[in-house]
Amino acid sequence: MRSDEVKKGFDRTPHRSLLRATGLKDEDFDKPFIGVANSFIELIPGHFFLDKVSAIIKEEIRANGCVPFEFNTIGVDDGIAMGHDGMLFSLPSRELIANSIETVMNAHKLDAMIAIPNCDKIVPGMIMGALRVNVPTIFVSGGPMQKGYTKDGTPIDLATAFEAVGKFEAGDISEEQLKDIECNACPSGGSCSGMFTANSMNTLMEAMGIALPGNGTILALTPQREVLYRQAARRICEIAKDKASREKYKLKNILNENAVKNAFAVDMAMGGSSNTVLHMLAISKEAGVNFELKDINAISKRVSHIAKISPSLSTVHMEDINKAGGVNAVMKEMTKRGNDILADNLTISGETVLEKIKDAYIKDTNIIHTIDNPYSQVGGLAILYGNLAEQGAVIKTAGITGSRVFTGTAVCFDGQPEAIKGIVSGKVKAGNVVVIRYEGPKGGPGMQEMLAPTSLIMGMGLGSSVALITDGRFSGATRGASIGHVSPEAAEGGMIGLLKDGDEIHIDVDQYILSVNLSDEEIAKRKADFKPLKKPLNSSWLGQYRALVTNASSGAVLKTDL
């Protein structure tokens, strides 16, 4: 066992002495050591109960002949960090989480791991760190939140709360209605109830085979969720106690190229958050998989969009997907379009993908559509290219309700705060393309989410007549014609930084085009005169991050070959 490096032999006497101080006995030194990577934090609705989850998992690990060691990562709640400079720290926290997993697991030579994420950057951060360690790992998330209801019985969620601010600003709802939404949008613990970033990633872990079935959809704080926690604990012990299994189920043997492609395929079928693109590119790099942004459109063309979930369809939430058959039912239906839609990859459960889904079926075709009645014949995400995004940009096509072709005039803002002021003051009109720049990984730094501006646009009734492009990113709760991750970003001299108010911008989602109607001569002239804005910083960590981070087309990973 890997842990023998710290617990076997006379020269490890001091190591065992330290471990005995934590409560270990003689017999424990012959058992596998299991890391329990928790992300308990009282600030986050999806994480404040994870101390109880880890207690259940550790109890089950002990009962199955292994020794659990719990440690914790940090966590940032994107909703609470939204709309102020706290959001600068959200994406960088992914790297800190990955580094902390790698550090603890390797410093103490643990044999296997159960990771307990749930929200936002914590899920991809844990996956990235676990890939560096490459021991058998099962991810078991806290679980999704219940949807809320207003006093009149309308289903709501966090996206409703953000959009309600714009409606209140526009005079469309009263302060009493705003308060009703505030008090009922998030009624329980769990990851926010729609197909936002957290639940998108928790779902994709099922698709990749690194989490057990139900991980993305079984509600938090329910007896069914506890069953899942205990199943995961028993399974990791089965693997850790067997030498051949410890080798067979190393994380990189599960999370390989086929797993990445399966994840993107399920992402397309379910219309996941655009943040999944950023995170899956980063995960691919850690897995040693050669997968690039340009490969995503090829998958999208082969996968039908068969499940719409909030924010794309405000009445449907993760609990509804669970009742309709869950992720396995979606995956089973996907295979009816072609035998090669999903690769029959090994999963951490011991079954292959096709074995795992063989008995799954759709229980409610109003929630999960059949392959013969899709929302769209192509997937719910697209990558756009053109002179405005030479290295690509991302749009969640599942969130578009109006035309998929848009031409409008630019209204430019150097940062999210300036954009929010401009939108609220009425500077943005129908027919405009809102340009928010210097919010990329380097420019922010930290690549803020633009949920506040997009929610204001939707809430003020401009959602079908205004588009938004940014080198920043979007919350999974964003909907509408919102294009993010524009690369190269403004801070590295990208075309988005050269735009001026009044420039004509053309968007054609079905042709994968994002361009500005300028001559080559005009573009060359602007480039010659251009000096990117560099924002002042008073944060040591963000300064380090800005110096090391790559752009969104590479997953915003940190450079390591300095």
Swiss-Prot record:
Mg(2+) binds at D78, D120, K121, E449. Pfam families: ILV_EDD_C, ILVD_EDD_N. Disulfide bonds: none annotated. Binds 1 [2Fe-2S] cluster per subunit. This cluster acts as a Lewis acid cofactor. One of its GO terms (cellular component) is cytosol. PROSITE patterns: ILVD_EDD_1 (PS00886), ILVD_EDD_2 (PS00887). Its cofactor is [2Fe-2S] cluster; Mg(2+). Its EC number is 4.2.1.9. Pathway: Amino-acid biosynthesis; L-isoleucine biosynthesis; L-isoleucine from 2-oxobutanoate: step 3/4; Amino-acid biosynthesis; L-valine biosynthesis; L-valine from pyruvate: step 3/4. Transmembrane segments: none annotated. InterPro entries: Dihydro-acid_dehy_C, DihydroxyA_deHydtase, DiOHA_6PGluconate_deHydtase_CS, ILV_EDD_C, ILV_EDD_N, IlvD/EDD_N. GO terms for molecular function: 2 iron, 2 sulfur cluster binding; dihydroxy-acid dehydratase activity; magnesium ion binding. HAMAP family: IlvD. Homodimer. Belongs to the IlvD/Edd family. Functions in the biosynthesis of branched-chain amino acids. Catalyzes the dehydration of (2R,3R)-2,3-dihydroxy-3-methylpentanoate (2,3-dihydroxy-3-methylvalerate) into 2-oxo-3-methylpentanoate (2-oxo-3-methylvalerate) and of (2R)-2,3-dihydroxy-3-methylbutanoate (2,3-dihydroxyisovalerate) into 2-oxo-3-methylbutanoate (2-oxoisovalerate), the penultimate precursor to L-isoleucine and L-valine, respectively. This is Dihydroxy-acid dehydratase. It comes from Aliarcobacter butzleri (strain RM4018).
